[in-house]
Amino acid sequence: MWNYEKRLEFPVNIKRTDPKMAQLIITQYGGPDGELGASMRYLSQRFAMPYKNVCGVLTDIGTEELAHLEMICTIVHQLTRDLTPEQVKKSGFGAYYVDHTAGVWPQAASGVPFSAATFQSVGDPIT
């Protein structure tokens, strides 16, 4: 069970709109090695652990990854929340903006949406 604190683990306070940077950082949210996949890997793999203390460590790590996910989403949101139409056009953010406006959507920097195919969970605790 989690105890959610309504604050970020590390404060994020970005004042400047920068859709180019958001396009790069968003891969840390939904890219193949991003926080969403990492949290799911740890929280899923914990069930294969025969030792409760190791299971607990994986739960802790997966929970930590969720905190990272929240920070990454906050960064992307703050970088795009005040976009002007000119910034959308100039930055190349248009394709993302058409589908999601300034919403935060899990995808790689390449535009490939997050997929559960990027993580694995097996019953063997060694692999």
Predicted regions, residues:
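Non-heme di-metal
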Residues: 1-127
